């Protein structure tokens, strides 16, 4: 998932939200939004999950609204994914090639829009153009990497039905559980330690890592390491590589 940049339109700017299936390359969403705020983005994912089921993981870059610089890279959107049992993965900064298939689709979209004078068009008209691109890309354009097939012929929805219900998470029996206060802090060893205000009211787990260091997780998502000596949670620098939910492996990723 990503935004294909943004461009001027009549009365504002258009931000095309794109979501594709990693296996079949089917473009599941190519929808123009007026901004990148959670309020407009989440309904698109809710629609996608209702129509196609939920994936096991989602890959994005580190931009808004997919990630932030807070602990674990959590944003309101990525927390929503984690609450639904979806693993969030991110490319390393400055390495769009790590999501190469999606980036190649973006180049095709850019070429498709090259002759459009977007400044003269309303958002509704631009959305129709994006819908037309998605239809051609999925159903008419043969892909060499797919052996000449079209993405729609290979795509299969996820068997994970979306209900909108957040299932309580059971932590490992060895984990020490702490509740995050409204300030974003937890109480640990007699002192307050800042975690994340985004997790206020949630339970996080601390797992022994060794020599006074504890791995901190929200559900299956790693947040960082708490050091008893410093009393601080240090964020992970390569956290996406160890973020593995306790779910079966599956091809389904968007």
Spans of model-derived segments:
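RNase H-like DDE/DDD metal-dependent nuclease/strand-transfer catalytic core used by mobile genetic elements
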Residues: 3-18, 22-131, 136, 230
């Amino acid at each position: 998932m990503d935004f294909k940049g943004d461009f001027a339109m009549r009365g504002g700017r258009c931000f095309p939200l794109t979501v594709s299936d990693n296996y079949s390359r089917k473009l599941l969403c190519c929808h123009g939004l007026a901004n990148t705020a959670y309020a407009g983005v989440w309904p698109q994912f809710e629609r996608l999950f209702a129509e196609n089921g939920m994936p096991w993981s989602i890959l994005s870059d580190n931009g808004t609204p997919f990630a932030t610089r807070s602990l674990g890279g959590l944003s309101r959107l990525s927390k929503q994914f984690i609450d639904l049992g979806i693993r969030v993965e991110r490319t390393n900064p400055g390495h769009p090639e790590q999501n190469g298939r999606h980036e190649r689709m973006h180049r095709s979209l850019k070429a498709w829009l090259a002759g459009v004078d977007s400044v003269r068009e309303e958002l509704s008209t631009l959305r129709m153009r994006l819908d037309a691109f998605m239809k051609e890309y999925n159903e008419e354009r043969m892909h060499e990497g797919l052996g000449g097939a079209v993405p729609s012929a290979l795509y299969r929805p996820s068997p994970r039905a979306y209900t909108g219900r957040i299932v309580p998470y059971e932590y490992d029996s060895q984990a020490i559980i702490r509740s995050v206060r409204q300030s974003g802090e937890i109480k640990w060893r007699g002192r307050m330690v800042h975690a994340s205000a985004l997790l206020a009211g949630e339970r996080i787990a601390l797992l022994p890592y060794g020599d006074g260091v504890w791995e901190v997780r929200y559900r299956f998502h790693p947040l960082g390491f708490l050091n008893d000596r410093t009393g601080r949670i240090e964020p992970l620098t390569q956290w996406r590589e160890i973020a593995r939910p306790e779910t079966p492996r599956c091809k389904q990723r968007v």
